[in-house]
Amino acid sequence: MQINKYIDHTILKADAPKSKVQQIIDEAKKYDFMSVCINPTWVSYASQELKDSDVKVCTVIGFPLGANTSELKAFEAKNAIENGADEIDMVINIGAAKSKDWNLVESDIAAVNAVKGDKLLKVIIETSLLTDDEKIKACQIAKAVGADFVKTSTGFSTGGATVHDVKLMRQTVGPDMGVKASGGVHNLEEAKAMIDAGATRLGVSAGVAIMEGLTSNDNY
């Protein structure tokens, strides 16, 4: 198992200075991680820093609340892609999901999907705020719209990825769609548990700890 290729090496904290973003980029190059996951303000910089590597640039849209309008999410995604993003992790309209307004959840995802072109779209459903039935419905909609992945969490809400949720999401979307576990994966043992449950990508700030067989204290 090339576990490095499961890892989106992540820094999304509001107070992360350029030096920390550079550290994440350098570590991603060293360990040949699948991507760095960074806030949109750093996309242009990361794209330049990673242009001679295989590491992708991943960014977040409508993050972390998912409460922006669909039009704004689409603009944000388009702008990120123009700046060099290879992968887009968008947050669903969580309030719409809790209101059972599934048409709005669908059109919101579709608005971003329409501008992604050949880039990857991951849909964050924020599992800690949804019932199992809502998780299933959100995953079904993301798949129907044409997203490439469903993703558990922002890492900024009440909880992160769990084995239960990853299994449920995998069962819902079937074998061909990506499932990203993010938030609360701190070490190699936890990473393997998520992969065994069906995750094909891991959103972690603990990428180096996972590779070194250590445990990180970071929440994401």
Curated annotation (Swiss-Prot):
Q: What class of enzyme is it?
A: lyase
Q: Does the keyword Lyase apply?
A: yes
Q: In which pathway does it act?
A: Carbohydrate degradation; 2-deoxy-D-ribose 1-phosphate degradation; D-glyceraldehyde 3-phosphate and acetaldehyde from 2-deoxy-alpha-D-ribose 1-phosphate: step 2/2
**Active-site residues (renumbered):** 89 (proton donor/acceptor), 151 (schiff-base intermediate with acetaldehyde), 180 (proton donor/acceptor)
| Example of a GO cellular component annotation carried by this entry | cytoplasm
Q: What is its EC number?
A: 4.1.2.4
> So which domain of life are we looking at?
Bacteria
Tell me the GO molecular function terms: deoxyribose-phosphate aldolase activity
Q: What are the alphabetically sorted keywords of the record?
A: Cytoplasm, Lyase, Schiff base
SMART domains the record matches: DeoC
Q: Where in the cell is it found?
A: Cytoplasm
Q: Name one GO biological process term.
A: 2-deoxyribose 1-phosphate catabolic process
Where does it mainly reside?
cytoplasm
Protein family (similarity comment): Belongs to the DeoC/FbaB aldolase family. DeoC type 1 subfamily.
User: According to its UniProt entry, what is the function of this protein?
Assistant: Catalyzes a reversible aldol reaction between acetaldehyde and D-glyceraldehyde 3-phosphate to generate 2-deoxy-D-ribose 5-phosphate.
Q: What is this protein called?
A: Deoxyribose-phosphate aldolase
Question: What organism does the UniProt record list as the source?
Answer: Lactococcus lactis subsp. lactis (strain IL1403)
The top of its lineage is: Bacteria, Bacillati, Bacillota, Bacilli, Lactobacillales
